[in-house]
Amino acid sequence: MDKLQNIRGVAFDLDGTLVDSAPGLAAAVDMALYALELPVAGEERVITWIGNGADVLMERALTWAREERATLRKTMGKPPVDEDIPAEEQVRILRKLFDRYYGEVAEEGTVLFPHVADTLGALHASGLSLGLVTNKPTPFVAPLLESLDIAKYFSVVIGGDDVQNKKPHPEPLLLVASRLGMMPEQMLFVGDSRNDIQAAKAAGCPSVGLTYGYNYGEAIALSEPDVIYDSFNDLLPALGLPHSDNQEIKND
């Protein structure tokens, strides 16, 4: 399409786009909830909370857990629990617990989606500048990229703590475009959620929406990205590079 004709660089979301991080995130969320004697949520539910950064993830987890506990107690004929700790303080405690547990399980609970490693390698070898924009807390990002052996492909990495405003605000995309030395319209942004597409539109970047990510249970088509792909390596022909159906699926 016309918007992809003058692309000089590509920036990517992380969770749900390059990596399946749900197992690790869900494990850390559940361990944090369990430590506070709250109901655990499970991976299927946690997936619907991913995408707005760790603080929002904690808020969603705590809201659900308190409501779930109240429902369970009512079902058993027990009175509601008096909350000794305000919700804001409980979120802060939950976040500290989450950070500790996620640091323990992040690497083993995260794998690359199919074709990601080889596609990134092909894009990098073609001379395109590559960047990463994630709402994930910054301290977790670099070690994770290194463990998956994809850090070498990115010239710029922007984590959730590196900007004042996370996606869907355009700030992180505008920052990575600036650091890559290009105009926003020259940088393609690839993501799996409405936050990604909204950020791209607000920044003036063309966008690709991937169908296999998390996106709160919604179809990515509802966010109206410029292009929709089912497989990560569909990016290659779109950018004038050979498409390989035999790329290595690297998830070790």
From Swiss-Prot:
SUPFAM superfamilies, alphabetized: HAD-like
Active-site residues, Swiss-Prot/TrEMBL: 13 (nucleophile)
Record's keyword terms, sorted: Carbohydrate metabolism, Chloride, Hydrolase, Magnesium, Metal-binding
Pfam families xrefs: HAD_2
Chain residues that bind Mg(2+): 13, 15, 192
Keyword Cell inner membrane assigned: no
Free-text function comment from the UniProt entry: Specifically catalyzes the dephosphorylation of 2-phosphoglycolate. Is involved in the dissimilation of the intracellular 2-phosphoglycolate formed during the DNA repair of 3'-phosphoglycolate ends, a major class of DNA lesions induced by oxidative stress.
UniProt-recorded name of the protein: Phosphoglycolate phosphatase
The organism of origin for this protein: Salmonella typhimurium (strain LT2 / SGSC1412 / ATCC 700720)
Gene: gph
